[in-house]
């Protein structure tokens, strides 16, 4: 890799120059997150749409003024005059809701200034621009009552009291709270309750048993029906329209369907180069026809046989779903409104098959869209789309205005390609996965070139031509009820740039692939099939000649950190080192210390993980803490002191069990962080330490240690000081690579070429990285989710805007 420049950690993993771009409801302004010029802290910037193109200029104004953690979750208020955003203290996730006038230099106002109280489930409405609805656990820390809040005056009034089991609230077109999602603590089921008015009694509309999936999208405009996604009667979720009063279903159906645009065949917009792209269109009907015997189901609108419903683009004035995204391996779209067919065709044609399209935001009237193009080997591009210009026939070049790239510095570097691969577990279960390979300046003619359009799915056909193998990092996503996806993953690119192959596996229990795949992971932590899937993926990479079996690292955060500890404890022969970020080590103490507001979901956690609190044998079997004696590989442990989900004790106890055993164990505690590392000094300090740790054990490249001035790290133990660290010598690295080349770089380049050649037989096909899913990047608008991580650690360590569970509801579906 001597011809591939080393990418500095700050370029890959520092704060992005631009992120979370949005358009104001009136379409006049563009907003985005950008570091402040003096503190490198993310804040909200605003520019007029007339000055949209290019990098920040004189028209751009920084409207928030955070100086420490930065703003990560924000939205426009419906008046287009205020920004509302959430902020916690030191990663404790006790979110406060703030408001900032965009035309004022005054400090932001804390609208929920209550100590120890968390704000979430925030709903806005275009017909009530002065108000928001917000959930607060002020009365009872275990549950959230809905309050009505005036943005300008700060007046707060109780709207709807929580009976104790409601985990999410929804408002209708009149801005009245009329639906609630309740959890049954006895069996883990979810019930959607509705009422016909603010003073009416609640009634149960639909129940999803613990093994089923369902969520609310929005009320229809008529208030007599509601859009949901549901897996009842099928494996993957589908978009459905339900009557909120089944007794009046025929009348509600006639009225709701009359409001919907006339549809011919539902259009599936996809790339022909995608090997499994057609799967996203399966289940697309010829119009809004019911496919369920449930009298509440008025129509079934969109579905795929391969994956669940992803993001839903909604007309917020008419309260109609316009298009639906599906993400199996890459993003595909089903367009429900025929008037948007030409728009999507134009937008998708602009970048072709090399990029995935997401609609980040829309003006209230739908005339201005803010779209993003994600690639696996380049920065994300944001553009402003003018529908009126497109209608005038000017084409993509005239209707699309380039806004900016999230990390423009990456344009100077060569990045690795991210290959979707369908792996097979030992029991035949298919595991959608992603393999990122180090970049090559060129592919030697003696090797097979990568094939961008393989003929069929699967992992057959991969293999090493030269016989040289790469070090491998198995990068395990958190959740575990989340997923990895396609697109730029800065953490994977960091490893690839250092000379490592990177394998990311959607193991069973990952979300988005249907309820069967999700629940195959129930009770399978640690020594079960969830961990077997990871081991099988490593075995595939070794067997295919991609990975050197002596140099495999396991890296992950949250559940991924648990998987790291489990891998080192239960399959110690497989890994030469590991990195555990905020990972639980003792399942009983994890379940016993969940946040109070997770109490309604406790039964769901027990059903999915196992009753480790009541079954001592199970707890001992799946908790890495009890198997510390089996660990023999070097390990880094990293923890945020204020983590409310995986408490500091989880890292303390595994470190205490390992220290003094003769192992190389390094433990880094960040005192002003929570479930991930939001502050760049801490993030870069951590990544620099990992950079050198992996170089030592995998033989890759590294940059000199970073000396961060404002980090909160406490190094509880270090095997070697970074000041004394010396990278492996060239001869040692070459020997480790198994190469005859006397140059370490020569051996690495040959191994890279061998792995690149193996691409020839892999199945590649598509889904936008991050999307509304996992990885979190578009987490605005999601309600409270329970899981060890949503979109971490990849988003956290890549400096993305979201590092925690997203807590704004009603700001999504996509505008």
Kindly give the residue locations of the regions a language model identified.
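Non-catalytic accessory segments flanking enzyme active sites
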Residues: 19-22, 41, 72, 95, ...
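Active-site-proximal cap/loop segments of hydrolase catalytic domains
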Residues: 504-733
């Amino acid at each position: 890799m001597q011809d591939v420049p080393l990418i500095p950690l700050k370029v890959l993993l520092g704060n992005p120059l631009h992120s979370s771009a949005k358009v104001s409801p009136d379409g006049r302004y563009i907003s985005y997150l950008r570091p402040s010029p003096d503190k490198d802290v993310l804040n909200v910037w605003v520019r007029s749409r007339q000055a949209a193109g290019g990098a920040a200029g004189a028209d751009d104004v920084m409207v928030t003024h955070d100086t420490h953690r930065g703003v990560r979750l924000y939205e426009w208020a419906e008046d287009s005059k205020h920004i509302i955003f959430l902020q916690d203290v030191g990663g404790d996730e006790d979110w406060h809701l703030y408001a900032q006038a965009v035309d004022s230099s005054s400090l932001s106002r804390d609208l929920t200034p209550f100590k120890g109280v968390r704000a979430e489930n925030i709903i806005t409405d275009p017909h009530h621009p002065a108000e928001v609805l917000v959930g607060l656990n002020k009365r009872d820390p275990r549950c959230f009552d809905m309050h009505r809040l005036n943005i300008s005056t700060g007046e707060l009034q109780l709207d709807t009291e929580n009976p104790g089991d409601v985990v999410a609230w929804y408002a209708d077109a009149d801005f009245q709270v009329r639906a609630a999602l309740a959890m049954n603590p006895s069996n883990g089921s979810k019930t959607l309750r509705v009422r016909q008015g603010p003073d009416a009694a609640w009634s149960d509309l639909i129940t999803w048993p613990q093994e089923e999936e369902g969520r609310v999208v929005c009320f229809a405009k008529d208030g007599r029906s509601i859009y949901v996604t549901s897996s009842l009667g099928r494996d993957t979720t589908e978009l459905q329209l339900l009557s909120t009063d089944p007794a009046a279903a025929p009348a509600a159906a006639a009225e709701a369907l009359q409001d919907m645009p006339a549809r011919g065949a539902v259009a599936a917009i996809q790339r022909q180069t995608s090997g499994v792209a057609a799967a996203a269109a399966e289940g697309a009907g010829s119009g809004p026809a019911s496919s369920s015997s449930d009298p509440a189901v008025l129509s079934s609108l969109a579905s795929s046989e391969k994956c669940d419903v992803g993001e839903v683009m909604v007309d917020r004035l008419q309260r109609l779903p316009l298009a639906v995204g599906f993400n199996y391996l890459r993003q595909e779209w089903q367009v429900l409104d025929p008037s948007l067919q030409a728009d999507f065709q134009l937008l998708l044609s602009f970048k072709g098959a090399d990029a995935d399209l997401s609609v980040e935001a829309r003006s209230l009237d739908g005339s201005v869209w803010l779209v993003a193009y994600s690639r696996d080997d380049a920065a994300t591009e944001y553009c402003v789309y003018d529908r009126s210009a497109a209608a005038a026939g000017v084409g993509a070049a005239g209707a699309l205005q380039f806004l900016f790239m999230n990390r423009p510095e990456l344009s100077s570097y060569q990045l690795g390609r991210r290959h979707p691969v369908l792996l097979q577990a030992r029991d035949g279960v298919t595991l959608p996965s992603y393999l990122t390979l180090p970049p090559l300046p060129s592919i030697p003619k003696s090797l097979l070139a990568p094939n961008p359009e393989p003929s069929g799915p699967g992992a057959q056909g991969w293999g090493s031509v030269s016989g040289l193998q790469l070090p491998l990092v198995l990068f395990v996503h958190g959740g575990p009820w989340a997923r990895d996806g396609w697109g730029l993953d800065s953490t994977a690119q960091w490893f690839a740039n250092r000379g490592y192959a990177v394998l990311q596996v959607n193991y069973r229990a990952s979300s988005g692939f249907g309820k069967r795949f999700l629940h195959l992971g129930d009770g399978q932590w640690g020594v079960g099939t969830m961990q077997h899937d990871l081991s099988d993926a490593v075995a595939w990479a070794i067997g295919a000649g991609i990975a050197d079996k002596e140099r495999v690292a396991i890296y992950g955060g949250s559940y991924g950190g648990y998987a790291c500890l489990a891998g080192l404890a239960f399959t110690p022969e497989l890994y030469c080192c590991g990195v555990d970020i905020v990972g639980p080590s003792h399942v009983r103490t994890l379940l016993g210390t969940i946040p109070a507001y997770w109490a309604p979901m406790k039964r769901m956690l027990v059903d999915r993980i196992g009753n480790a609190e009541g079954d001592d044998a199970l707890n001992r079997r799946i908790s890495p803490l009890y198997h510390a004696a089996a660990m023999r590989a070097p390990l880094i442990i990293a923890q945020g002191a204020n983590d409310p989900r995986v408490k500091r004790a989880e890292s303390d106890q595994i470190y205490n069990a390992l220290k003094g055993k003769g192992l190389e164990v390094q433990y880094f505690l960040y005192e002003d962080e929570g479930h991930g590392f939001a502050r760049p000094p801490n993030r870069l300090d951590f990544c620099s330490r990992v950079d050198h740790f992996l170089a030592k054990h995998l033989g890759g490249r590294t940059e000199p240690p970073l000396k961060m001035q404002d980090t909160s790290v406490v190094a509880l133990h270090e095997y070697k000081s970074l000041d004394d660290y010396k990278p492996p010598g060239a001869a040692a690295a070459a020997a480790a690579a198994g190469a005859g080349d006397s140059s370490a770089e020569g051996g690495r380049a040959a191994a890279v070429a061998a792995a690149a050649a193996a691409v020839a037989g892999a199945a590649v096909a598509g889904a936008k990285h991050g999307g509304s899913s996992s990885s979190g990047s578009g987490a605005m608008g999601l309600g409270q989710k329970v899981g060890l991580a949503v979109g971490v650690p990849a988003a956290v360590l890549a400096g993305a805007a979201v590092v925690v569970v997203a807590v704004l509801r009603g700001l999504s579906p996509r505008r």
